[in-house]
C-alpha cells in the first residue's frame, strides 16, 4: 500500500454474539482501534454475550445475570465496534457479500464469521406441537421452557420462587446439571429420562451409580418414554409417559439436547452435515471469505495428511473447544489484516497448543456439588472384549456410590469413566490428556479417594491444568493470586480461569486459601 493512500478497513461481520463470538471480538479489537477492521457484530438476543453454561446457576439464584456477562456493549461501541443486539438475520447474499436482516437492512462484508451456536431440541410430544425446529420460548405453552438463555432462567427462577415442582425432561448432562442445581437450592425436582438410567449412553454401568447419587441429592428419578404434556387451565400440569403414568409438576424444563444452527449456511448453499463444514483453518469448505466457529461448526478437513484434524469432528457443544477456535481465527485475522505481520495481543492468554502427540479429545465433566462424574475417550469396550493390545479394568461399589472404568491400548489410557471418585477422576483425566501409561496395578489409582489417599495426596503441580475451558494452569492462577487477586472473580478477570463452565471455581478458591494460609503461617 502506498503510505499516502487512505487506509481502507476490511469489513468483518460476525453473526452471533455468544461466548465464542465474544472471544473473537476481543482479538479483533486492536485491529478496529488501528483502523484496519470495520467490525459489525449481529446478536439475535437482546442481551450482550454472556456465559450460557452458567444460565442454570442464574435460574437457581447462585449467581446473577451481571456476573456471567462476557462483554460490555457500551465499551465495545466506544472502541468503534458496531454491536447490534436483537438483530435477526434473514439470509446471506454470497454473490454480493452482504448479510440481509429481517428489517430490510443489508450489511456488507469482506469476511464473514458465523458463530450462530446451537438451538435446544424441541421434543415431539403431544401438547408441544409447534413450528419445526423452533426454539422460540414464546411458542411454548405457559409453564414450559428450555434452559438456554437468560429469558429461560427468569422463567425457571419464577417457578422456584413459587415453590412449584420442577420437572426436567432429559437425562443428559444438561438435564442432570439443571436438576441438581435446582435441588441443591431447595427446589422440588423430578428428572424424567429415557432408558434405564440417566447418562447411560456415556457412563454405561456407572449411570446406575449416578442415578443413586441423584436420588440421594433429593431428586425424584423417573425412567420412561414421554408421550406428551398435559395442561390445566392453560398451564403445564404434568408429563404423560407410555403406559398412562403421569408425572405431575408446576413447571417443565426441556433438556433434550441441542442441534447446531445451520439454517443461514444452508440458505446460502454452504456445505452442511451436522454442522457447517469447515476445514482445519475453520473456513467454510470451498469458501475464501466465510468462517464458522463454535457449536455451529463441524471440522471436516479435506487433507488426508493433516494430523491436526484427523478426519471429521462434529460440533462438541463444549465452550473450551469453541474458545480455541475463536483464538485460532482471531490470530489468523490479526496476521492477515494488521499490515505488519501481526498486532501484539494484550490481556488474556489463549489456551496453549498441546503439541503433537498430546490428546485434545473433549472430556465431559458433570458440574455439581457432591456428585462427581467424568467420561472421556472410548468407553464402549468391556472387560471381556478380546482385541490385541486392548485391556479394560472396571470397578463398581454401588453401596458407596463409586464406579470406575479404564480402557487402555498397549498400556496407554484411551478411555475412562469415573463416578463418585473426584481425585481418581482428576488423575485419570491428566493421564488421558498426556497419553500416559497406567500403572500395572490399576487399582492403585482408586486409593486416591480413600481416607489414606486424602491424607497423603499432594496437590497438583504448577503445570497442571486447573481451568479446562480456558486452558489455564494451576501455576498461572497461583501467580495471579501472588500478584494480588483475592477472589475467584479477580482471578477470572486476570487469567480467564473460571469463566467457562465454572467447574474449577472450587479449585481456584483452594489456591487462594492455600496462598493466604501460607502467608499467615510465615
Task: Give names to the regions the model predicted.
Residues 2-82, 179-202:
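Beta1-alpha1 glycine-rich phosphate/pyrophosphate-binding loop at the start
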Residues 16-19, 44, 148-149, 169-174:
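Glycine-rich Rossmann-fold phosphate-binding loop(s) that bind the pyrophosphate
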Residues 38, 77-100, 107, 184-280, ...:
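A Rossmann-like FAD-binding core segment of flavoenzymes
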Residues 132, 137-163, 235-240, 246-328, ...:
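FAD-site-proximal beta/loop scaffold in flavoenzymes
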Residues 453-464, 482-499:
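Immediate flanking context of iron-sulfur cluster ligation sites
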Residues 463-477, 493-510:
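Local cysteine-cluster metal-coordination motifs and their immediate loop/turn environment
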Amino acid at each position: 500500500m502506498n503510505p499516502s493512500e487512505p487506509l481502507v478497513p476490511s469489513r468483518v461481520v460476525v453473526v452471533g454474539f455468544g461466548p465464542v463470538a465474544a472471544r473473537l471480538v476481543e482479538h479483533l479489537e486492536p485491529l478496529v482501534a488501528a483502523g484496519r477492521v470495520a467490525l459489525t457484530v449481529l446478536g439475535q438476543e437482546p442481551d450482550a454475550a454472556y456465559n450460557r453454561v452458567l444460565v442454570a446457576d442464574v435460574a437457581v439464584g447462585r449467581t446473577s445475570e451481571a456476573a456471567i456477562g462476557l462483554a460490555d456493549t457500551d465499551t465495545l461501541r466506544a472502541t468503534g465496534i458496531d454491536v447490534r443486539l436483537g438483530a435477526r438475520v434473514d439470509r446471506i447474499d454470497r454473490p454480493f457479500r452482504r448479510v440481509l436482516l429481517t428489517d430490510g437492512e443489508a450489511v456488507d462484508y469482506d469476511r464473514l464469521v458465523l458463530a450462530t451456536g446451537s438451538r435446544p431440541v424441541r421434543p415431539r410430544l403431544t401438547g408441544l406441537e409447534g413450528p419445526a425446529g423452533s426454539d422460540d420460548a414464546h411458542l411454548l405453552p405457559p409453564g414450559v421452557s428450555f434452559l438456554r438463555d437468560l429469558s429461560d432462567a427468569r422463567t425457571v427462577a419464577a417457578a422456584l420462587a413459587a415453590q412449584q415442582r420442577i420437572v426436567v425432561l432429559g437425562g443428559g448432562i444438561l438435564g442432570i446439571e439443571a436438576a441438581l442445581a435446582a435441588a441443591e437450592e431447595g427446589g422440588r425436582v423430578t428428572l424424567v429420562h429415557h432408558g434405564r438410567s440417566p447418562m447411560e449412553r456415556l457412563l454405561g454401568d456407572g449411570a446406575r451409580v449416578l442415578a443413586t447419587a441423584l436420588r440421594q441429592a433429593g431428586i425424584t428419578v423417573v425412567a420412561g418414554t414421554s408421550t406428551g404434556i398435559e395442561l390445566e387451565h392453560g398451564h403445564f400440569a404434568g408429563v404423560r409417559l407410555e403406559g398412562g403414568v403421569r408425572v405431575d409438576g408446576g413447571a417443565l424444563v426441556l433438556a433434550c439436547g441441542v442441534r447446531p444452527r445451520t439454517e443461514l449456511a444452508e440458505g446460502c448453499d454452504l456445505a452442511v452435515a451436522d454442522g457447517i463444514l469447515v476445514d482445519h483453518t475453520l473456513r467454510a469448505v470451498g469458501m475464501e471469505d466465510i468462517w464458522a466457529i463454535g457449536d455451529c461448526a463441524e471440522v471436516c478437513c479435506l487433507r488426508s495428511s493433516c494430523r491436526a484434524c484427523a478426519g471429521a469432528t462434529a460440533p462438541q457443544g463444549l465452550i473450551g473447544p469453541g474458545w480455541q477456535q475463536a483464538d485460532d481465527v482471531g490470530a489468523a485475522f490479526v496476521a492477515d489484516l494488521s499490515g505488519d505481520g501481526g498486532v501484539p495481543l494484550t490481556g488474556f492468554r489463549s489456551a496453549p497448543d498441546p503439541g503433537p502427540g498430546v490428546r485434545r479429545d473433549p472430556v465431559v465433566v458433570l458440574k455439581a456439588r457432591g456428585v462427581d462424574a467424568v467420561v472421556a475417550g472410548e468407553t464402549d469396550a468391556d472387560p471381556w472384549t478380546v482385541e490385541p493390545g486392548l485391556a479394560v479394568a472396571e470397578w463398581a461399589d454401588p453401596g458407596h456410590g463409586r464406579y470406575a472404568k479404564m480402557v487402555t491400548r498397549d498400556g496407554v489410557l484411551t478411555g475412562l469413566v469415573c463416578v463418585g471418585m473426584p481425585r481418581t477422576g482428576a488423575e485419570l483425566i491428566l493421564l488421558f490428556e498426556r497419553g500416559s501409561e497406567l500403572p500395572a496395578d490399576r487399582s492403585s489409582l482408586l486409593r486416591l479417594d480413600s481416607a489414606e489417599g486424602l491424607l497423603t495426596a499432594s496437590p497438583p503441580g504448577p503445570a497442571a491444568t486447573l481451568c479446562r475451558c480456558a486452558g489455564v494452569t494451576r501455576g498461572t492462577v497461583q501467580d495471579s493470586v501472588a500478584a494480588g487477586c483475592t477472589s475467584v472473580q479477580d482471578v477470572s478477570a486476570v487469567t480467564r480461569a473460571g469463566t467457562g463452565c465454572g467447574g474449577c471455581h472450587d479449585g481456584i478458591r483452594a489456591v487462594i486459601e492455600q496462598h493466604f494460609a501460607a502467608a499467615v503461617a510465615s
